[in-house]
Design a protein with these regions (language model features):
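Active-site neighborhoods and metal-handling regions in enzymes and metal-associated proteins
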Residues: 3-166
């Protein structure tokens, strides 16, 4: 989530890469496709975007900034164990690409300390993927709009802890 009411140009650029990567991976999350193939698609989009921004030179360098996997099963546990071969109908998985650029990275400092990750829950069906969290704003414009709205918790006051604990 954007911590202010708008993204900086650098945050916006990185967010768009992650968003594009996720959109492509969601569309590729078809029964019969492999977890590996959708990860590779996502990784390639992130690597290409980072190259276009001049953050990396070689696509293999993207791993520094996209150091995690793309997906896991959701079931009885949030990170349910399971077969990570081919996707099958009725599986529920996450698709969550991300980019993290720590301070002192070998790129322009304007990119430092930016972290973007977008996670959605996807139901695999024989007719195609269904995004179970599609009702939440996901693109940067939708998030900026949401961040400018008044919070539903604006006047909410948390009770004092010592009143709750006896």
């Amino acid at each position: 989530m954007c911590i202010r009411d708008s993204f900086s140009p650098e945050q916006k650029a990185l967010y768009q890469i992650v968003y594009d990567s996720q959109e492509a991976a969601i569309q590729a999350a078809q029964a019969g496709n492999s977890f590996r193939s959708i990860y590779q698609l996502s990784y390639d989009i992130v690597a290409d975007g980072l190259q276009q921004l001049g953050i990396i030179i070689e696509s293999s360098e993207a791993k520094k900034y996209y150091p995690h996997g793309l997906s896991h099963h959701i079931g009885l546990d949030v990170h349910d164990p399971g077969n990570y071969g081919k996707l099958e109908a009725n599986m529920v998985i996450t698709i969550e690409p991300g980019i993290y650029i720590p301070e002192n990275s070998p790129c322009d400092p304007k990119w430092w300390n930016i972290g973007i990750r977008i996670e959605d829950d996807i139901l695999i069906t024989n007719e195609g993927p269904i995004n179970l969290s599609a009702g939440v704003p996901r693109d940067w414009k939708g998030i900026e709009t949401l961040m400018k709205e008044e919070s539903a918790l604006k006047d909410f006051i948390l009770p004092e802890i010592n009143r709750l604990v006896h």
